[in-house]
Amino acid sequence: MSAPKNEMYYSLLEWFKTLNLNAPHADAESLADGVALAQALNQFAPESFTDAWLSKIKASAVGSNWRLRMSNLKKVTQSVYDYYSDVLNYSLSDFSKPDLQSIAEKCDLGELERLLQLVLGCAVNCAEKQSYITEIMCLEEELQANIMRALQELEATRQASSAEGGVVSSLSRSPRTGILDSKAVQEDRDALAQKCFETEKKMLLLIDEKTNLQQELHKLQQEFARLEQHSTVIGDDGVSLGPVQSGSVRYNELRRQLDLLKEELLQSEGAREDLKLKAQQQDTDLLHMQMRIEELMKSSAEVTTLKDEVDVLRESNDKLKICEAQLDTYKKKLEDYNDLKKQVKILEERSADYVQQNAQFEEDAKRYANTKGQVELFKKEIQDLHAKLDAESSKNVKLEFDNKNLDGKNLALQRAKDSLLKERDNLREAVDELKCGQLSSNTALTGTTVSRELQPSATVEKLQRLEAENKALREGQGGQTALAQLLDDANKRCENLREQLKTANERILSLSHASQSDDPILKESEFGKQIKQLMELNEQKTLQLEEAVTQSTSLQCKVTQLETNLSAREQEILVYDAKYRKCVEKAKEVIKSIDPRIASALDASVLEKSADLVEDEPKPKMSVMEEQLMTSAFYRLGVNAQRDAIDSKLAILMGSGQTFLARQRQSAPRKSLSAMKSK
C-alpha cells in the first residue's frame, strides 16, 4: 500500500480539524507551538492531562521564538509517553520519537505526523473513544484508510501482545496466583479490552468493505442491464460495436468482461465468506473474551476482597505488634512494681526500725534533758569551785606570807632559845616544884573550860546537823546502797571529827601550857605543826578542786558527745523519714497508674500495718549498765555536793576573825575520799 508523500499527515490534519478547540489548528504552523495539541489531550483525558498541566503550556509561544515552542512540545510529548506507559500500558520503545526541534524550527511535516499519530492513539484509547471513532467513520474513505494505517503502525509497535498470552496462560495454569496478583489481572483485562476494540474496528472495516463491494456489484449489474437493453453501442473511439451476438467482437468483449466480473464476484464472495467466518470466529472470540473478562472481573472482585482481608490482617498484625510491645512494657512495669514492692517492704521494715530508734532517741532525749539540768548544776558548782579555788589561792598567798613571817619569828626565837637554854638549866631545879603545882591546877581549870566551851558550840551542832542530813538522805533515797555508803561516810566523818576534836583539845592544852610556860622551843614546834596542818589542808583543797574540775570536764565532754549523737540521730531520722515518704509516694503513684483500687487497698493495708507496728512496738528499756552508771553518777554527785557543802560551812566557821584558840577548837575540814585513798 504505497501512498503519496505526507498523505497520512494531511489525513491526520483533516481529522484533527474536526476537534472543537479554542487554539488555531488548521495548519502545521499553528500546531508547531503545541497549544492545540495540549488542548486536544486535555479534551481526551482530563484526568491525566489536567487543567494544572494545561496551564503550564505557554500560549504565547508563537512567532520566531522556537525555544518556547520547543518547551511546549517537550511537555506534550513527555505527558503523552507517560499516558501510554502508565494508563494504557503501551510500550513505545520501537516507535520512533518525533524530532521536536525540527518541528519547532522548520515545522517538519514528517515529525509532526508522528506526533499527530500519538495524539490519535490517545483519542481512540480514551474513555470517550466511541464518539471519536464515529467521527473518524464519518470522514472520507481515503482519510479513514490513512487513519487506520496510522493506527496499525502504532499498534505494531506495542509490545504487550506477548505479555498478554503469558499472562493468560499463567492465569489458566495457576488461577490462585492470578487472583492474588491484581496487577496482572488488570493488565490482562486491559489487553482483552484492547483486543475487543481492535476486533470491533476490523469488523467495522469489513462491513464497510462489504458495503462497498455490494455497491460496486450493484453498479455492474445496472451497467450490464443497460448494455443488454441497447443493441448498438458506440465504443470509445466512436466506432459502432454492433449488436450483441455470439462470435461478434462486442459479444466477446462483453463475455470477457463478464468472466472478469464473475471471477471478481467469486473472489468477493470468497472474501465475504472468509470475512463471515472471520467475523463468526471473532464473535466467538469476543464471547470468550467477554466471558474471560467476566471471570477476570470476578477474580478482580475476589482479589479486592482478598486485598481487604490482607489489609485487615495487616492492621490486625500491626495491632498485635502494638499489643506485644505494650505487653513487654507492662511486663517491665510489673517487674518494676515487684521491685518496688520489695523496696516498700524493706522501707517498711526500716521505717519500723526507725520508729523504734526514734522512740529510743526520744527517751534518750528525755533522759538527756534531765542530765542537762544536772549538767547546769555541775556548771554552777564548777563556777563555785573556781571561786573557792580563787579564795583558797588567796588564802594560800596569805599563808605563805604568814609562813615567811613565822620563819623570821622562828629565827628570832631560835636565837632567844639559845640564850634561854643556859638560864633554863640554872633555874630548872629551883622552879621545878613550883612549876609542877601550877601546871596541875591550870590543867584542871583549862580542861573544864575547854570542855564547857566546845561541847555546846561545835560538836553538838555538827553531830545534830550530820544526823539530820543522814536522816534526810535516808528518807529521800530509802534503802539504796548509795545511801548506805553515804551513811558509812557520815559515820566515818563523825569519828574523824571526834578524833579531830580530841586532837584539838590536846593541842589547846599543849598551846595553853606552852603559852603559860613561855617556852620558845614548844612554840616553835607548835607553829611547825600548824604550818604542816595548813599545808596539808591546802593540798587537800587543791586535790579536791582538781578532782572536781576533772569530773566537770568529763561530764561536759559526755554531755556534748551525747548532744552531738542525739542531733546526728535526729538528722538521720529526718533523712530516712523523707526517703521513706518519697519511696512510699512513688510506690503509690505506680500502683495508682496500674490500678487505683489496688492503690486504695494498699494505702489501707499500710495504715493498718503502721498502726499495728506502733501498737505492738515494745518500749525500749534502759540497759542495766546505763541504770548502774546513772545511779552511781547521781550518788557520787550527791556525796561530792554534800561534802563540798560541809567543807564550805566549816570554812565559814573557820573565819579569819577568830582567835587562834577559837580556830583550834573548830574541827579540821575533812579530807576527800580520793586523798584518803591516795594516802
From Swiss-Prot:
InterPro entries: CH_dom, CH_dom_sf, Hook_C, HOOK_N. Keywords: Coiled coil, Cytoplasm, Cytoskeleton, Developmental protein, Endocytosis, Endosome, Microtubule, Synapse. SUPFAM superfamilies: Hook domain (SSF116907). Involved in endocytic trafficking by stabilizing organelles of the endocytic pathway. Probably acts as a cytoskeletal linker protein required to tether endosome vesicles to the cytoskeleton. Involved in modulation of endocytosis at stages required for down-regulation of membrane proteins that control synapse size. Not involved in synaptic vesicle recycling. Required in R7 cells for boss endocytosis into multivesicular bodies (MVBs). Has a role in regulating adult longevity. Homodimer. Interacts with microtubules via its N-terminus. The coiled coil domain mediates homodimerization. Gene3D superfamilies: Calponin-like domain. It is found in: Cytoplasm, Cytoskeleton; Endosome; Synapse. Its main location: cytoplasm. It comes from the Eukaryota. GO terms for cellular component: centrosome; endosome; microtubule; synapse. Residues 6-123 form the Calponin-homology (CH) domain. Residues 135-437, 480-574 form a coiled coil. This is Protein hook. The keyword rRNA-binding does not apply. GO terms for molecular function: dynein light intermediate chain binding; microtubule binding; small GTPase binding. Pfam families: HOOK (PF05622), HOOK_N (PF19047). Belongs to the hook family. GO terms for biological process: cytoplasmic microtubule organization; cytoskeleton-dependent intracellular transport; determination of adult lifespan; endocytosis.
